[in-house]
């Protein structure tokens, strides 16, 4: 899980993850972690417009990072991936606008949406969560 996830309660944190993936059981593991963050106060959007593979973060309309690095143990330790750190309000606001457009093609993860998932999907997500150090 993300370090400092309790900050979601105090600060506005919005996360978009793909509703589908190119890797089996990845959405279930992602949903499991997203559900935990949702319970802490983060808004989680499930992107329905296809497979969304971007790794972008915008902070306070002044700073953003864009790149290929996944925030998981394997990528941070072993993979040769990188992100650009951009300190430019104009670029950050353009990315914010793109995010807001993508929100229109997304489903907000709510307790009701979570409850509609089958027990099997929840179990697969739990197992996937246990395996995240190896993914």
Across the structure, where does each feature detected by a protein language model lie?
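A transmembrane-helix-recognition feature enriched in membrane-embedded lipid enzymes
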Residues: 116-135
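Structural recognition of alpha->loop->beta junctions
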Residues: 32-46
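Glycine-centered short loops/turns at secondary-structure junctions
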Residues: 10-12, 41, 61
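Short, small-residue-biased leader/transition segments that mark boundaries at the very start
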Residues: 2-9
């Amino acid at each position: 899980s993300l370090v400092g996830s309790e900050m979601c309660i105090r600060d506005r944190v919005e996360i978009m993850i793909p509703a589908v993936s190119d890797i089996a059981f990845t959405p279930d593991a992602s949903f499991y972690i997203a559900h935990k963050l949702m319970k802490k106060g983060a808004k989680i959007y499930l992107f329905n417009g296809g497979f969304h593979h971007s790794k972008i973060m915008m902070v306070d309309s002044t700073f953003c990072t864009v790149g290929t690095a996944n925030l998981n143990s394997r990528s941070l330790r072993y993979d040769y991936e990188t992100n650009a750190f951009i300190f430019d309000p104009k670029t950050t606001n353009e990315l914010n606008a793109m995010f807001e457009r993508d929100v229109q093609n997304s489903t907000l993860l709510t307790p009701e949406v979570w409850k509609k998932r089958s027990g099997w999907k929840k179990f697969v997500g739990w197992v996937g969560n246990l395996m995240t150090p190896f993914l």
